[in-house]
Amino acid sequence: MEVREILREKGVVGAGGAGFPTYAKLKEEGIDYYIANGAECEPLLDVSKEIMARFPDRVVKALSILKDFTGAKSAVIALKGKYKQAVKALDAELLKTGLDIKLFEMGDFFPAGDEQVMVLEVTGKVVPEGGIPIAVGAVVNNIETLYNVYGAIEEDSPVIQKFITIGGQVKNPITLKVPVGTTIGWLLDFLGVDYKDKVIIDGGPMMGNIVDSNSPITKTTGGLLIFPKGHPAVSVKESDINRILKLARIACIQCRYCTLQCPRYLLGHDLEPSKIMLSMGFKLSDRYIKQALLCCECGLCEAYSCPQRLSPRRVNIAIKKELAKAGFKYTTGKADFSPREARQWRKIFTGRLKIRLQLMEFDRPALLVDGDFVKPPEVHIPMKQHIGAPAIPLVSSGDKVT
């Protein structure tokens, strides 16, 4: 069975973000760079960092397999230079194996892990507006995805477990492996985490979403962060969307900070969040409104840039939904893109972001405790944990599974 079919059969999807099926990225021509994304730019999450430090052999072997299968000219593991243990472990593994894979050490800025930002950093090329990395000859997989690729190919293992970080307002932050489908509330109770009358974020403080304790862990869950209600990391997420849209119409002072610091604007894309905010009283046909489709939803605008604490991110998400209903798709007349000159000095240092969001008191290592010690009495498996059509179950009600 070829690599693509193995990954499809074993259910390997992007372990972070939208869960793009990994097999669908594997073209056998036109790939110059195969990039492993180890930046893990969301504060308080340690999954990728811990996997690289503890399992460098799996990461390196999986990347080598995918490089060989696709015929990629170059394979790169991109991670922040400050991840000293991960850098040391990967360097040692590459020295031992002699594989033609390079490490690319990135600065400590947000969002270093955005795949289009990473492609520019590694290759010097800008992914076109509305495009994906393959448009400039690059493929990007995150570190846990590579861990699962190794399991699928070398161990015949399907993706039935997920690494997650438990952090925020907890006594002992931890990174661990749990069965997919584990109920969040059961897991937090098992770990002795107090989450009553608090907010649970699925993901990081920037791009994560508020979830209910009855929700299950999925293949794309990167972490569970616990915060007190009203904390700066969750206040905008808790706000009603109608209130956010109203404030966008009446409270935006057009300072343009959201635009000047927007990662996609700095890539050279035609995205100006400040003009979208200014256009909120107009129709969907307004040309600035359509720019919302270029937003990567990193949250830098709402968490760091806006002095009014408005949320261009959530405004853009709401606009995207309306444009999708209208069947609108973004098209660009430009063929070549270059990053804006100001990009080099407008990168936002992650430490400043942590201070702005009042995360410093929670910024403690969440070391990996390996082992299959989390054994829930039952799991709830959503059929749609990825981009594309829902999965089709191979078992029926009443079947015994192991």
Each predicted region: which residue ranges?
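Conserved phosphate/anionic-ligand binding catalytic regions in large, soluble enzymes, centered on
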Residues: 11-27, 303
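Gly-rich Lys/Arg/Thr-decorated short loops/hinges at beta-loop-alpha junctions or inter-strand turns
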Residues: 36-48, 170
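Ferredoxin-type iron-sulfur electron-transfer modules in oxidoreductases and energy-metabolism complexes
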Residues: 227-249, 259, 264-343
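Histidine-anchored nucleotide/phosphate-binding helix
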Residues: 53-70
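Active-site gating/interface segments in enzymes
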Residues: 109-112, 118-125, 198-253
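Flexible, glycine/charged-enriched surface loops at secondary-structure junctions
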Residues: 72-77, 100-101, 195-203, 262, ...
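Flanking helices and flexible, charged tails adjoining ferredoxin-like Fe-S electron-transfer domains
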Residues: 16, 44, 293, 297-298, ...
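Hydrophobic alpha-helical positions that pack around
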Residues: 76, 81-184, 190-195, 204-205
